[in-house]
């Protein structure tokens, strides 16, 4: 099994979000029953972000995300799947696939 991180992203070009159609509880239940869901959660809005940078030994802390963008990461899920095809199938069932974008990345273990 391969662990994948799903970045749940907003998409200003997608249909407007409809809370009544957000069946995240059903999706989580289905993925837990299948044994693929590991962990996930929402993220606070970008206004609550803090960016930390260290350059030449100097700490720089700034409010907001690291990039100016209309898209933002709204949440994440970590899943465990047999392969990328299964991860794509799992992501395609996520409610936010209809209202945003889901980026899938394989986790690259540090091996510690």
Predicted stretch roles:
Residues 1-112:
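Conserved, structured core segments of small domains
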